């Protein structure tokens, strides 16, 4: 339960830190979609969505990896925890998956003969 609360707070703070504090042009338009913190609060998986193609995604991930130490120290100063979780950034594939499913459903309905 506590890990969920910490994850929600981290999601809010990470969104603010990334949009306002980071000046790396590689990061671009990025959204933190979810943060899952391990039960022992040692690791936080940060799921991100990036606007653009694969190259933009890879560039954004490189920028985040380079700024990981700064981001972690900012989180540590904003959220009171004994130890700030280690950050792991991953792409959130659920949005693309959802869009693909929606497209397939739309195609099925448009191919269906009207009754």
From Swiss-Prot:
InterPro entries: KH_dom-like_a/b, RbfA, RbfA_dom_sf, Ribosome-bd_factorA_CS
Localization per record: Cytoplasm
Source superkingdom: Bacteria
Biological process according to GO: maturation of SSU-rRNA
Molecular function terms, GO-annotated: ribosomal small subunit binding
Alphabetical list of Pfam families matching this protein: RBFA (PF02033)
Chief location bin: cytoplasm
A single cellular component GO annotation: cytosol
Keywords: Cytoplasm, Ribosome biogenesis
Keyword Cytoplasm applies: yes
Keyword Transcription carried by entry: no
Subunit organization: Monomer. Binds 30S ribosomal subunits, but not 50S ribosomal subunits or 70S ribosomes.
Function: One of several proteins that assist in the late maturation steps of the functional core of the 30S ribosomal subunit. Associates with free 30S ribosomal subunits (but not with 30S subunits that are part of 70S ribosomes or polysomes). Required for efficient processing of 16S rRNA. May interact with the 5'-terminal helix region of 16S rRNA.
Family per similarity comment: Belongs to the RbfA family.
The name this protein goes by in its record: Ribosome-binding factor A
Organism field: Bacillus velezensis (strain DSM 23117 / BGSC 10A6 / LMG 26770 / FZB42)
């Amino acid at each position: 339960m506590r890990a969920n609360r910490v994850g929600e707070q981290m999601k809010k703070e990470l969104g603010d830190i990334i949009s306002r504090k980071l000046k790396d042009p590689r990061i671009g338009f990025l959204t933190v979609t979810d943060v899952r913190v391990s039960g022992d609060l040692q690791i936080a998986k940060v799921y991100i969505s990036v606007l653009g193609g694969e190259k933009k995604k890879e560039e954004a991930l490189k920028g985040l990896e380079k700024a990981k130490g700064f981001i972690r120290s900012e989180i540590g100063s904003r959220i009171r925890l004994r130890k700030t979780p280690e950050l792991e950034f991953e792409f959130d594939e659920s949005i693309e998956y959802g869009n693909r499913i929606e497209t397939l459903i739309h195609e099925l309905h448009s191919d269906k003969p009207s009754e």
